[in-house]
Amino acid sequence: MLIDSQSVKTNYEGEERGFHGGKKIKGRSRQIAVDTEGNVWAVHVHAANNADTVEGCVVADLALADLQTVRGVCADKGYRGTFFNHVRDGWKLDVHISGREGKGFEVEPKRWVVERTFSWFNGQRRLSKDYEKDTTSSEAMIYIASISRLVRGHSFN
């Protein structure tokens, strides 16, 4: 299972909204858990100023409650600390935290799958930005987009 987040802008004074200092985005973060095929198993939307390491625990719990065959979890450096300990100690799973080494762009093994899933979402007009007032509606739109992708055969084309 792979977990990552994406920060998106939102216009509305909705349920949860915050400023992500590192990415300079005022809006929300989408946490998703996907399998190695890029299929979405869990979604959690929250204010962008909340830490990934804490909010990642929520999406991990949602996904792992339904999945019995997961052997490990991959995430990036934003998930060190609380998330790492929660999954390793609470769920008794191997956790692989990937990190960059050196300068420039590098394709990280397995991590590109979750990034590809986010790029598929950007092909959906409704998900290019967070237009929803509450986070549950935003989560529902992500699930609908992933179902649409499955029905069409793994692409939005």
Stretches with model-predicted labels:
Residues 49, 67-137:
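Helix-centered, glycine/charged polyanion-binding patches within enzymatic domains
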Residues 137-157:
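C-terminal domain-tail junction helix/linker
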